[in-house]
């Protein structure tokens, strides 16, 4: 071989080795001191969290389920459009809107479960295994660790929302020539719902085990779902007690209120006139409830940071 030959070095690090290197770099003082320290450390933590999440089977199972869900939705949408080709355009648009709304409802449930199940052991699992000591004992603020992990999972959930909810909207647009009204508002509300559950799960993960954290979050999500039904039934039958119970459940966990606000933005007139159903919103949550949900998500993240700061490792 000549002296001028070019040597090509192929990287041989596995994903696990790369994650370990990122953690080591994150824990070093130079990683904190170089550049804007807190921002740099948070971004590095988010990258590590994202890569760790990519190794989990549940993430790929959820992605596969999401892809199959989109195939199922496209097949049903195509069959519906084919069978209603002879109907007036306005009737077909109503049908597309109803079908899209049902798909988004199912997609929001999948995204919510994804938020709870993938992050329930992000802190409790590392505390139990002792791997958190490799990071928490370094010159890295604990609240920065929580923020970095939240950012990593939030990025993952953003991609999942784009895959599921964005995929449903894109299929309705290209297959049915139907552009969802208020698309940015609807997408933001659905993302906020997932981010809300993510913050609650992380707050629970600082104190409870992974299984308990997931159970608490999903239990609160179920409470909000049932409370939303009770509130809609109370509004339909003019039962004030049921409406009050629904409002209280929304204050405890505003996830269902976010869905009903999104449903109000996209529901067709025919579905809205049908009365109470999971796909229609008889009693529309106010903008104040959306603001409350945003504050709820922020306070959940702050609570997670405070609890983790006080946790004896």
Q: Can you annotate each of these PLM segments?
A:
Residues 121-154:
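Helix-loop-helix units of permease transmembrane domains in multi-pass membrane transporters
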């Amino acid at each position: 071989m000549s002296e001028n030959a070019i040597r090509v070095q192929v990287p041989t690090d596995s994903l696990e080795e790369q994650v370990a290197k990122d953690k080591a770099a994150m824990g070093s003082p130079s990683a904190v001191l170089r550049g804007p320290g807190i921002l740099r450390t948070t971004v590095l933590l988010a990258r590590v969290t994202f890569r760790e999440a990519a190794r989990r089977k549940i993430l790929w199972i959820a992605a596969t389920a999401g892809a199959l869900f989109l195939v199922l939705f496209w097949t049903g949408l195509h069959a519906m459009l084919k069978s209603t080709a002879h109907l007036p355009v306005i009737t077909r648009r109503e049908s597309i809107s109803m079908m899209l709304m049902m798909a988004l409802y199912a997609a929001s449930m999948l995204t919510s479960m994804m938020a709870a199940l993938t992050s329930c052991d992000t802190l409790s699992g590392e505390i139990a295994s002792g791997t958190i000591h490799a990071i928490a004992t370094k010159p890295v603020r604990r609240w920065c660790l929580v923020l970095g992990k939240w950012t990593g999972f939030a990025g993952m959930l953003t991609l999942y929302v784009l895959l599921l909810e964005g995929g449903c909207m894109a299929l309705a647009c290209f297959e049915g020539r139907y552009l969802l009204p208020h698309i940015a508002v609807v997408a933001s509300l659905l993302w906020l719902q997932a981010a809300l559950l993510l913050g609650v799960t992380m707050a629970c993960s600082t104190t409870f085990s992974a299984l308990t954290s997931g159970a608490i979050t999903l239990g609160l999500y179920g409470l909000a779902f049932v409370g939303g039904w009770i509130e809609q039934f109370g509004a339909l039958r003019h039962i004030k007690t049921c409406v009050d119970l629904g409002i209280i459940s929304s204050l405890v966990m505003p996830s269902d209120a976010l869905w009903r606000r999104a449903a109000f933005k996209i529901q067709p007139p025919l579905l809205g006139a049908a009365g109470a159903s999971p796909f229609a919103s008889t009693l529309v949550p106010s903008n104040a409830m959306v603001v409350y949900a945003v504050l709820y998500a922020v306070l959940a993240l702050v609570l997670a940071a405070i609890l983790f700061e006080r946790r004896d490792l």
